[in-house]
């Protein structure tokens, strides 16, 4: 049976990751349900949770340069697309799967079809105390699943999280999906899956490479970058919604500058060609 893991944030080092996973997020829209004037000066952004560490750094630079504060909510791209379609007051949407942006554009909910800003990668991650040995072809994981020595493995929910879908594709590519399915623990998004793995709620997880590189995880475990051939490309697209303020427009443009792109690259994202 596929299960959903417990939310555990046992150290200060995982606090930021837990926040991105939704552990400390209040009621839906609580951080963005403010008056129109506030929205105009402090744009509300919905961002895929794999962006947590990279986007925090970019937004900090943007705020220093412009004086504009930004409110970012992290979560799964599929859930954000549904919320925007239902009227959530986000002004800029950074999706981990470009299809969600295209769907909103087709419904007239974005100003245009946006721009491709990054290509994501996935990695097999294991905390230091886990017996699992990460390798690019998932050979140790395969052996452990087949001999019954594997514990639970965390991935994001493939139903609405692009990184969960990529994890499923990778597991299918090596012929492991059917055998490992009963051992999976699903995160609401990839940050929560990473939290489960890093906190010891699972033996490991297939998570965003950008999260595996981040200090809270890198210091607590080890990982192997998986070949791109194991899954469909994670083409990450962003677009301004029809609610976009001038501040959101400025952030959208800032994200396409060389300095912002360099930060994305340093955090493990491949950059699309201009």
Where does each model-flagged region fall?
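Intrinsically disordered, metal-sensing/regulatory segments
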Residues: 8-9, 13, 166
């Amino acid at each position: 049976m596929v299960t959903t893991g417990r939310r555990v944030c046992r150290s200060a080092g995982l606090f930021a990751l837990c926040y991105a996973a939704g552990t400390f997020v209040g009621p839906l829209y609580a951080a963005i349900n403010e008056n129109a004037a506030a929205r105009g000066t402090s744009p509300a952004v919905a961002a895929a949770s794999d962006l947590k560490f990279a986007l925090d750094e970019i937004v900090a630079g943007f705020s220093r340069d412009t004086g504009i504060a930004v409110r970012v909510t992290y979560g799964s791209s599929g859930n954000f697309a549904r919320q925007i379609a239902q009227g959530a007051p986000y002004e800029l949407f950074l999706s981990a799967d470009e299809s969600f942006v295209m769907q909103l554009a087709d419904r007239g909910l974005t100003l245009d079809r946006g721009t491709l800003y990054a290509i994501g990668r996935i990695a097999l991650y294991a905390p230091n105390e886990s017996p699992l040995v990460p390798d690019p072809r998932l050979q140790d994981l395969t052996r452990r699943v087949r001999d019954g020595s594997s514990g639970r493995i965390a991935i994001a929910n493939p139903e609405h999280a692009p990184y969960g879908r990529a994890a499923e594709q990778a597991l299918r590519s090596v012929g492991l999906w059917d055998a490992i399915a009963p051992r999976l623990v699903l995160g609401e998004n990839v940050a929560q899956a990473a939290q489960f793995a890093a906190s010891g709620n699972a033996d490991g997880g297939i998570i965003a490479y950008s999260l595996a590189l981040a200090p809270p995880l890198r210091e607590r475990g080890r990982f192997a970058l998986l070949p791109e051939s194991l899954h469909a490309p994670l083409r990450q697209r962003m677009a301004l919604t029809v609610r976009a303020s001038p501040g959101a427009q400025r952030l959208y443009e800032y994200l396409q500058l060389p300095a912002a792109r360099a930060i994305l690259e340093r955090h493990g994202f491949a950059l699309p060609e201009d």
